[in-house]
Amino acid sequence: MGSELPAAAPPQPKRSTAAAAVARRRIGRELWQFWLDPPPYCRPGPSPVKDHFHWEVVIDGPAATPYAGGVFPVDVWFPYDYPFRPPKLFFKTKVYHPNIDGKGRMALDIFQDNWSPALTINKLLLCFVSVLFDPLLDRPTNRCIAKQYKHEYEAYEEKARAWTQKHSSTPIVSHYPPYAVIGSTPPAVPHFPATAARRKAAASSASGSVSSSRIPLLMKDESIWRRTMKFFQG
Amino acid sequence: MKFGAIYEEYLREQQDKYLTKCSHVEYKRLKKVLKKCRVGRSLQEDCPNGDQQEGNNESPDICKCNSCTLCDQMFFTELTKEASEIAGCFSSRVQRLLNLHVPSGFLRYIWRVRQCFIDDQQIMVQEGRMLLNYVTMNAIAIRKILKKYDKIHGSVSGRDFKSKMQTDHIELLQSPWLIELGAFHLNCNSSDIDETVGFLKNEFFKNFSCDLTEARPLMTMAISETMKYEYSLTCPICLDTLFNPYALSCGHLFCKGCACGAASVYIFQGVKSAPPEAKCPVCRSDGVFAHAVHMTELDLLIKTRSKDYWRQRLREERNEMVKQSKEYWDSQAMLSMGI
């Protein structure tokens, strides 16, 4: 893979074997569900899942975004008292995005205060892809990138595309176990509203006074995925 | 036969016998209000402004059709009141019935002695069926009247009211007590009881079935050929079949261990000892743990239908409870010694 970040396992608290067994059973069910019906643009990682508490997932860059064509491996670490504590998800490669920090973490409130045991890894990955497509600019992790996204969208797009090309262009083949029932592959048509295309269309329809480098964000046009995020955040 | 006639006949036959003091939907009266509204609408469309004004003065009962204040007042306040009364009546009656079926403590011994002389099982099954009819009939009546409201007014207020009923936990067919009653029905059907007991002439309630062998365990209630309700028996936390299930006051079902874990309390302390700020893991409503209800009939159903799974879960929960109580008393001892 491109330039990978060190993915150290978060320290696990001492828990009873019974609690770990409950967590293992739940993770097993989620893993099966993930093989059966993965969220859009998500698929299993290249190596087989040996430890239930550590997975590898691959997110394919959504079409009509600067991340299109990119292959983003994600490390998923489950705590031993899962689902009562949230899992930790890290991007293993560098991603140029307002909500992703240098360590590859995406700071969403569903990983902190708004975590609910009823949330599954499929829902979390759906959030990841959603935010990858449509950044949450009200609480950015990387303020410089957020500022650039707001005011110099084309420069942001160019840099994000360059980073994707540099760090996340190595193809990854998913590993499915022989007994897994593989669900339908994600369709080629993007599941998400084409944010970039929408923004460009809005810019072209607007009067000539608006420069192409300073395209305003369409805050009124709230996408379905933003609404999904709001639902998850309670 | 129209639903109105079926409903009236049902009220005549059943209300006096079994469900005295129980509230019901005033279907006929609400329908009359809608009829007046329709007449008012046609008058407003036909008459010019002056005539319309006179018409309004003559009959203040006819609703002013653009705002439909009369309908809104009559309808939604009345329906909310009726639905909450029906829900309350239904839950209390079901509770009373199930306390007789699965008694606890000293009542159990009294019940066993009583069973030597009187067989109340058939009467209980009959009452269970009556309650099922009561709740389904009223739910359909509410559904029909809201549909009619939307049709006459060309609005979606009825649909909005339906969703409001769900958030207020007065949606009759989403009640956890209905699941309990269904479990009771299935538990009684599994024992040898005369099936002909308590069937109605115009019975809407046809079938209650439960499948725990599938990947998604479900309980299905078929009111008619077209109306089917499915109740998931999967815990949203452990993603497994419910074990020792509890219904929070928002109506969501969880295993006892899962609910305690979500509320950050020890299993032996129980679901009700959860702090008031603890939220439901599914809908995030707070203060829902205080009035949590143990679903005894559903637990009994799962216990009888999947014995091996139930035993395995029981073993696991006991181990976890022992471990937790040891941890708790260790911490208490350390606290008392000032460590």
UniProtKB/Swiss-Prot annotation, chain B:
<keyword id="KW-0862">Zinc</keyword>
<keyword id="KW-0833">Ubl conjugation pathway</keyword>
<dbReference type="GO" id="GO:0008270">
    <property type="term" value="F:zinc ion binding"/>
</dbReference>
<feature type="zinc finger region" description="RING-type">
    <location>
        <begin position="235"/>
        <end position="284"/>
    </location>
</feature>
<dbReference type="InterPro" id="IPR033326">
    <property type="entry name" value="BAH1"/>
</dbReference>
<dbReference type="GO" id="GO:0016740">
    <property type="term" value="F:transferase activity"/>
</dbReference>
<comment type="pathway">
    <text>Protein modification; protein ubiquitination.</text>
</comment>
<dbReference type="InterPro" id="IPR004331">
    <property type="entry name" value="SPX_dom"/>
</dbReference>
<dbReference type="InterPro" id="IPR017907">
    <property type="entry name" value="Znf_RING_CS"/>
</dbReference>
<dbReference type="Pfam" id="PF13445">
    <property type="entry name" value="zf-RING_UBOX"/>
</dbReference>
<comment type="similarity">
    <text>Belongs to the RING-type zinc finger family.</text>
</comment>
<dbReference type="GO" id="GO:0016567">
    <property type="term" value="P:protein ubiquitination"/>
</dbReference>
<feature type="domain" description="SPX">
    <location>
        <begin position="1"/>
        <end position="163"/>
    </location>
</feature>
<keyword id="KW-0479">Metal-binding</keyword>
<dbReference type="InterPro" id="IPR027370">
    <property type="entry name" value="Znf-RING_euk"/>
</dbReference>
<keyword id="KW-0863">Zinc-finger</keyword>
<dbReference type="InterPro" id="IPR001841">
    <property type="entry name" value="Znf_RING"/>
</dbReference>
<dbReference type="InterPro" id="IPR013083">
    <property type="entry name" value="Znf_RING/FYVE/PHD"/>
</dbReference>
<protein>
    <recommendedName>
        <fullName>Probable E3 ubiquitin-protein ligase BAH1-like 1</fullName>
        <ecNumber>2.3.2.27</ecNumber>
    </recommendedName>
</protein>
<keyword id="KW-0808">Transferase</keyword>
